[in-house]
Amino acid sequence: MQPYLQLASLRLATTIPLAPRLYDANLLAASGAAMASSMAYIALLCAALAAVVALLRWAYRWSHPRSNGRLPPGSLGLPVIGETLQFFAPNPTCDLSPFVKERIKRYGSIFKTSVVGRPVVVSADPEMNYYVFQQEGKLFESWYPDTFTEIFGRDNVGSLHGFMYKYLKTLVLRLYGQENLKSVLLAETDAACRGSLASWASQPSVELKEGISTMIFDLTAKKLIGYDPSKPSQVNLRKNFGAFICGLISFPLNIPGTAYHECMEGRKNAMKVLRGMMKERMAEPERPCEDFFDHVIQELRREKPLLTETIALDLMFVLLFASFETTALALTIGVKLLTENPKVVDALREEHEAIIRNRKDPNSGVTWAEYKSMTFTSQVIMEIVRLANIVPGIFRKALQDVEIKGYTIPAGWGIMVCPPAVHLNPEIYEDPLAFNPWRWQGKPEITGGTKHFMAFGGGLRFCVGTDLSKVLMATFIHSLVTKYSWRTVKGGNIVRTPGLSFPDGFHIQLFPKN
């Protein structure tokens, strides 16, 4: 028994100390794990802190950009987004957008902002605007935000400079210059306006914006590319441009369901049609030039062509868009303004009925001499485009640091010349929101951009289609006021986002005059 007790005592003596040792080991292991966890937490906290500091520094640098001089006042908004959301906010009036108006009131006529990720100086100052246009190619160059470049193509005429831009401008003037207007386009526009108005008068009503857009598109697309809507390969071209236009000036979010995505899809499909037409033309034997596309194909076939296929396609796309959309919008808002101002319609009828009375054949078309005699009509057109403000901004980019009006515009920054801010300035135009064509009475015809009138641009890039646009508007007004009366059926409300649109259309009914 004794040995057993001794053995038991020995076992007890050797086993009892094991428990504290195991406890200590577990404690050490737990402490190590806790320490490792704490270290990981501290590391994570430091990383988060570093990220926050980096983010704050980035945000500070965004809102306080480096400059070699005094920047214009204003805010660049949130990083990357900037003030893009405010810029695209809808405005249901003809007045200056709240985005520009509020900032002019707060900062003055020159201020900085950020739109679609780029710092931009906005100018509502006539002197600065004129200076920017006059210094193109020296201190500034034509520029549009990346999203606009994606829409119109990276090789579109607005993105080209120097010799290539001048060459393309000369090419376009073959079609839209005064000689071709006198000899060909005046008669064709007059016939198109007569035919369309007669067709609309036979219908219960017409959605005017869509009707005018189709009329001008059919006319100009035929002159540009020999457009034939009866051909299966071309039947959807007008529809594709319609989709493109719906999202043209919208928030640049390219995901399905957004207006911008619809715009990009419209461009892609329109370019597919144009590319197919180009391949067909290139495969055909050489022929005399019948339309503008033939001139382009002729250039592409040269041994050392100045054009590339990409530049040619982007050029055709931009010309098709510019040829019909802006004029269609101006004419639509013009008819709306005439509807609201019957005294102006009476004065127009007086001028145009006098023209008809002086004709040998009352049913003959408008001649060039008659067109040039439409003095009051010219005043009406000037007033329409002043109030329409189809183009909310004209963009340029500083090629170097530019000192102007006590401010420094850093190299690489964008400049947005704001025509509406000038056209609606009460210090320049008395009662600027009033439709008053007589304000232009006795003033010389404007043939280029001025400090106080930029509806057709300014400087070297004054719109080459200005004369065609004026001819279209004048011949349309001539047939409208001499052959018809009309009434509004529904719609007519406008929205600027910031581009002009008629969200519920503008439906009118035409009544032929006896």
From Swiss-Prot:
Expressed in roots and coleoptiles, but not in leaves. InterPro entries: Cyt_P450, Cyt_P450_CS, Cyt_P450_E_grp-I, Cyt_P450_sf. It is found in: Cytoplasmic vesicle membrane. Keywords: Cytoplasmic vesicle, Heme, Iron, Membrane, Metal-binding, Monooxygenase, Oxidoreductase, Transmembrane, Transmembrane helix. GO terms for cellular component: cytoplasmic vesicle membrane. The keyword Metal-binding applies. It is an enzyme of class 1 (oxidoreductase). Its EC number is 1.14.-.-. SUPFAM superfamilies: Cytochrome P450. Belongs to the cytochrome P450 family. This is Cytochrome P450 87A3. It comes from Oryza sativa subsp. japonica (Rice).
